[in-house]
Amino acid sequence: MISKKIEALLNKQIQQEGYASYYYLGMASWCDFNGLEGCAKFLYGQSEEERDHMLKLFNYIVEAGGQALAPEIKKIPKDFKNVVNVFNLALKQEQSNTKSINNLADACLKEKDYSTFNFLQWYVAEQHEEEMLFKMILDKIAIIGTEGQGVYLIDNEVAKIAQNKPTPPSQEQQ
């Protein structure tokens, strides 16, 4: 059984993951609208991944005897300046998620909830991977540049990343 404090923090993380899912969905839509099919495919995948992260938390709370709450999603931005802006904002979103997960893990240690702390270690590792992924994309954008055919080349590079990224496991596999 988890404490009410940890339950509340886990539900807050559900909110964070739900927001990230919709945020990436909005970014994907913007990319699609602006002819960036590769970036859109990548961001649709990120949206699905964040939803899976949310459901994993949801199921954990229920299994631990708590009440998982469906997230309320605040308004999602729909307009972005350019592809650089999209990926800078995506990195900031991942950094926010990392901070939230780390705070949650810290609270678990303070509460001596080692089971939930152990559960969260997957998220800690995942957040490291996600931040590195978005930094790599931004590094590629910086190298390629956005002048001339740069945006086209960026879209192709991000499409390759989307193609090579493993599909998130379904909830039955987790």
What are these model-derived regions, one by one?
Residues 1-174:
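Iron-associated oxidoreductase/ferritin-like identity signal
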